[in-house]
């Protein structure tokens, strides 16, 4: 890898400033480039970004590792859906091969004791390829573009009782762009997701649907990001429709390695199915979200 490639790899990660990245526009580098999301992939909370995870190693092209693999990064999440009495923990790890191919893994444990299932185990394996670099072709407006997929497996008595599928595969395309011409830098990211998930895979998998997702983040200070995230609810057959997901989040880039995140998420009516037998706009309630992210 030559110096230009290494600089390009860094600049792409820096461009994720407002979604928990380093901020070239303000001349200060902080951790989280991007986050490991709940499923382990490089993104924010629910959604992926077009930027790949993991920083280059020190030493530039003189370090042979930069021709092979990035540094790893890790993220841990705690989701407290208090109104539904659901506790949700997640841990993810990711790195990038050849400055372009991201590989990720994630594990999630959901305790939904109120609904009779204290141990919902979710396993995720992901890959993402950055097809187009941000500001490619010597422009200032071309977004980074990536495609990716995540294999998901859910081990749960609830899945078995509802006769849904335990595993499935999500595919997505996403574009992300940092806008620096505004008074405060703004990151815009949007994509399409082909998924069979039922309640974010907490309840398993069914038929496939194509839905949209998006993020917007603003950086009012060099070490603080404030943003919103949205994921459209998928219609996955048999009358099942997931509720749209929303969250508002604040991230503090503590230093080059550590990022702390707090958020509030709304996933939809937690009791719709149990009260009315309706499978439309299914969700698992709302609550607070906290995350610790570490990047070597």
Labelled PLM ranges:
Residues 186-235:
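A mid-sequence, solvent-exposed acidic-amphipathic segment
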Residues 1-45:
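Cleavable N-terminal export/targeting peptides
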Residues 85, 241-242:
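Generic helix N-cap/helix-start motif at coil->alpha-helix transitions
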Residues 235-239, 258-261, 268-273:
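Short active-site-adjacent structural elements
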Residues 271-283:
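Solvent-exposed loop segments that connect transmembrane elements
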Residues 208-210, 242-246:
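Charged helix-capping and loop-helix junction motifs
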């Amino acid at each position: 890898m030559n110096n230009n490639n290494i600089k390009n790899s860094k600049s792409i990660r820096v461009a994720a400033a407002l979604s928990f990245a380093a901020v070239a526009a303000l001349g200060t580098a902080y951790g989280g480039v991007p986050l490991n999301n709940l499923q382990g992939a490089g993104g924010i909370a629910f959604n992926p970004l077009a930027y790949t995870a993991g920083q280059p190693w020190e030493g530039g092209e003189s370090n042979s590792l930069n021709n092979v693999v990035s540094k790893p990064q890790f993220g841990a999440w705690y989701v407290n859906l208090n109104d539904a009495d659901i506790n949700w923990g997640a841990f993810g790890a990711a790195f990038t091969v050849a400055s372009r191919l991201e590989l990720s893994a994630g594990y999630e444990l959901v305790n939904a004791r109120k609904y009779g299932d204290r141990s919902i185990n979710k396993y995720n394996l992901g890959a993402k390829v950055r097809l187009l670099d941000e500001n490619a072709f010597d422009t200032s407006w071309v977004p980074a573009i990536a495609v990716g997929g995540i294999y998901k497996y859910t081990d749960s008595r609830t899945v078995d009782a509802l006769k849904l599928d335990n595993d499935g595969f999500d595919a997505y395309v996403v574009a992300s762009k940092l806008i620096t011409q505004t008074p405060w830098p703004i990151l815009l990211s949007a994509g399409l997701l082909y998924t069979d998930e039922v309640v974010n895979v907490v309840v398993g998998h069914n038929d496939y649907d194509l839905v949209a997702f998006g993020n917007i983040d603003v950086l009012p200070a060099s070490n603080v990001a404030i943003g919103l995230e949205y994921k459209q609810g998928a219609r996955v057959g048999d009358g099942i429709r997931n509720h749209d997901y929303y969250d508002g989040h604040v991230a503090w880039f503590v230093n080059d390695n550590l990022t702390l995140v707090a958020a509030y998420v709304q996933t939809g009516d937690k009791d719709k199915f149990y009260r009315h037998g309706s499978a439309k706009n299914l969700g698992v309630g709302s609550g607070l979200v906290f995350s610790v992210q570490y990047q070597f």
